[in-house]
């Protein structure tokens, strides 16, 4: 199962034993009778902002009893006993646990609301419970009423008065102001309880949802056949604001009146519950705002639902084939209730769940491409974990099972997703599963090593996208994402820009939406982030995502200038190289264990330049758009991001290296090629291709190892083809190793010569003298002569040559050597260069004679 459920609260385990113990101490009758009565009536009524759970049950006298489970102390507390056999509909207690509000409704013995009995059907009470004292009747009406106390921002911040929301089935919402005083020490009394001030917050609404964590009220009004979504934010200073309103282009067919997160009425007519469409709103700390909607449908062939990404300005309408249902889930007495679908908030994802049919994990943080969401059908055995009964999503990734009274903490099951990743056959499945797992990178037990192993073994498995690119970009993104919420707008999330491949079992369409109209200015917290997202959608073209195009251009310019002898400002280049040193220092601290592959041990100036340029450009990019963030923090995030990227490349290679049990001796060219060598070489080639197309840096030493493995694995013509096309770079380290390790057999001579003639001049001059061979002397001589004659102008000279000063009488050679000696004596600086102090006209003459002798076979 892609979801993992951990029981956070179980009313039968956390409450029932305490109630039985209490009954035994008070001698309330036989234990079996108490157990039967309590067990049959015990249920969860409400969950408050601080996580405390309010429950109700019937005692052995049939009285309605309210209790509270403290999630911090894990203790139960009796709140109030209503000495009458009525069914509790709703209950809430203030943060000080001194005042309780509850609503009751009369039922017949069959458990159905009695609409024929005269008198008020619903009674709403306000009770002083510290100690139990006065009871105030708030409402006595024929329609249902729900109650909810507002909570301050912190438990220690006690308000001078309490505020109670009252939601009526007659489609209005009121807020009561309850002034509390203390008399005779700790005795709590409601002041002026007969005339409680109230505000009318909403009228003519058909749907409302309470966000208990953030103290927000969402509701939908019907105006002239239009559905208007609104939101009220209640603040710690007792004020409230209408934050936004937005027209919804949906027909709420069958939605007469529905509440979300105001408790759950277990005695509602099941057919009525089943015929209601599903609608709920989810937010998270990054400023996302999603509305999920599923109309009631009688179709058994397909299920349709919509997700309104209000923070993105569009909605997606999904149509899914139900898949093969699990008979254990769909059969039974509760089958009618499970016909609909449930939406569960998992933070960065929303789970869309149809019991026994499908589970969709929708990426709400980056919903643009459907390939970043995972779509599982009944064939994936998804029905094994989530219960078939109605589920109510709560903040903090909590879910209430409305029938069993259990509260679960729901997270993505990393083990399942990893197994799914190994067994997936479609690119869309691999992409989605990879992103689901990487979103858990900050969780304990994150299986990064197993993911890297899968990547290293499946580099060629995906055809719709480059797997290595996707892994590097997404993993580096998630490594720093938690530090700043705005990273989603500034850093690249995926290497894939478009996705046109169909996903089996799912169809979708995308429709643009008008953006929510914000009603408040000077926003803070979540609302500031939501507003920032909306401003980004309205005004940002193109997107602000960082890319390396500027770095690529500047890097190529620096390399070109070095080759042509031009130089930038010394301070500019020094700053770039210092940036690279900081990244390397950050990489070295990522692990204390010795590495198998000896990266970071050579200069590799080009990679250090690229590294330093990326640090500079990414830092400037973030500083431009994160002006309220400390510069030092941004600099550290940049170093973490780039060092993580380089470390992932290193880990990919080490995983493959370890898998094939390769020995460090592979770095010596006198050993023979093996299948393991070729596997690692192929992986390095794919990494190089992925990094080059994105202009990402590689660990210093990467190119040397890649070239050494290339010499091991490739025939000469293929090797030279790779070199000529820039796949293999001839670094000084790799060529030096080649000259030292290979003997002068005919095959190796051909290889060495082919390598030397392709070397840049500066490296070639250093490497040639390491090869004790006439061919090397010939190349050194040619380079020396070319330097001397570069600016040579022929001048009249004595045609007579002193033949006695030459070992061989060969006039063309003698004449040429004399010219060289004259040039050498006139300007020493022309031919002196590092490592070749002994190269002069004499050396050239000797090399020419040896080469001629060899050609003539003498």
Swiss-Prot record:
Which keywords does this Swiss-Prot/TrEMBL entry list?
Answer: Golgi apparatus
Report what the Swiss-Prot or TrEMBL entry states about this protein's PTMs: The protein is first synthesized as a holoprotein form of 98 kDa and rapidly processed into the gamma-secretase-activating protein 16 kDa C-terminal form, which constitutes the predominant form.
* Subcellular location(s) per record: Golgi apparatus, trans-Golgi network
Q: Which residues cross the membrane?
A: none
One cellular component (GO) term of this entry: trans-Golgi network
Q: Name one GO biological process term.
A: positive regulation of amyloid-beta formation
Q: Does the keyword Transmembrane apply?
A: no
Q: Is Transferase tagged as a keyword?
A: no
Tell me one Pfam family matched here.
GSAP-16
Q: Name one GO molecular function term.
A: amyloid-beta binding
Recorded family membership: Belongs to the GSAP family.
**Quaternary arrangement and interactors, per the entry?**
Interacts with APP; specifically interacts with the CTF-alpha product of APP. Interacts with the gamma-secretase complex.
User: What does it do?
Assistant: Regulator of gamma-secretase activity, which specifically activates the production of amyloid-beta protein (amyloid-beta protein 40 and amyloid-beta protein 42), without affecting the cleavage of other gamma-secretase targets such has Notch. The gamma-secretase complex is an endoprotease complex that catalyzes the intramembrane cleavage of integral membrane proteins such as Notch receptors and APP (amyloid-beta precursor protein).
Name this polypeptide is given? Gamma-secretase-activating protein
Source organism (scientific name)? Mus musculus
Q: Highest lineage ranks of the organism?
A: Eukaryota, Metazoa, Chordata, Craniata, Vertebrata
